[in-house]
Amino acid sequence: MSVAASVVNLGEIELQSGVVLPNLKISHATFGTLNASRSNAILMPTFYGGKHTDYEAIIGADKALDPSRYFIIAVDMMCNGLSSSPSNSDAPFSGADFPKITHWDNVQAQKKMLEQEYGIESLALVTGFSMGGQQANHWAAIFPDRVERMISWCGSAATAPHNWVFLEGVKAGLLADPTFSNGTYTTIPEAGIRAFARIWAGWGPSQAFYRHKLHQQLGQETAADHMQEFWEPNFLAFDANDLLGMMHTWQVANIADNDLYQGDFEAACNAITAKTILMPCETDLYFPVADNETQASLMSNVELRPIPSVWGHIAGAPGLNPVDSAFIDNAHRELLSS
């Protein structure tokens, strides 16, 4: 599979907060070839703790996301360590001084990158897992005339209060490490990140995932092994300020929280015209089906298709388990053929 990865410097960008960020960079990878009419573009924004390479597991000639048919752009959201982030920015915006990012900022930067680099003004599909699904929702609400189809799996249009509380708890585990030093650390706050990961381990999978010892399918014999061998390495691979930067974006996510909709969530949902499939997992502990039901009730041209899985939120993790990945692939295949 031919993959082209690059980092685009978009120059000076004013963020939703009013902060002007110089030399904003967007990292992405492309798969396939853009056709002459530029009508075969698919955008896949990344998720929390994810990078563009993670989507490679669900892209291929035998998949709905087929590079021989579509031009697929997997784009790194800000704060993930590849696009502009606390860890890779120069003073005065380095580390803890990096500005707060919203999904409005992510999608505006992605729009500029697509136009500047590829001349793309419309998308056949915007799709993503978790925070990638949140960005897909933002795209469809903010640019309804540019998005033909949208899939959000294990995601939401707005972060619910219970989800926000979960994230506050995880954050507290990291902040409690004195090494973190208000984000000015000179050595990795390893104890804090490990605590962060262990709290997360109780929320990413469902209760039934542990009850049925499904972590053994991932190579971890016990629940303790799963925490230490799956969750801890995943988060230790990230800079601590990057983790908190992405978390802020997640906590404040809301498609209506902008000048366009001025807090009117119903109006923002009503504005989405893209053919849409919302795919929460039946056992997701932080993006529950009920939240997606509320969103779907405010939209037209939408199907609510819960993932029938006991893997919880990680049912949507790209390529993590074959059954759920096939369910997600089938939804993409159906929507792209419509």
Where are these regions (language model features)?
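Catalytic active-site module of serine/aspartate enzymes centered on a nucleophile-bearing elbow/loop
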Residues: E293-A296, N301-S338
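Gly/Pro-rich cap/lid or specificity-loop segments adjacent to the active site
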Residues: G49-Q134, H138-A141, D145-A158, H162-L167, ...
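Active-site nucleophile elbow and catalytic-triad environment of alpha/beta-hydrolase enzymes
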Residues: E229, G245-A268
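Short alpha-helix in the alpha/beta-hydrolase fold that links the catalytic acid
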Residues: N258-F265, A274, L285-L298
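Short beta-strand/loop motif that positions the catalytic acidic residue
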Residues: I272, L278-P280
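Alpha/beta-hydrolase-fold enzymes
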Residues: R146, S152-P233
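Short beta-strand element of the alpha/beta-hydrolase
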Residues: R38-G49
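A short loop-to-beta-strand scaffold at the N-terminal edge of the catalytic core in hydrolase folds
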Residues: L21-T33
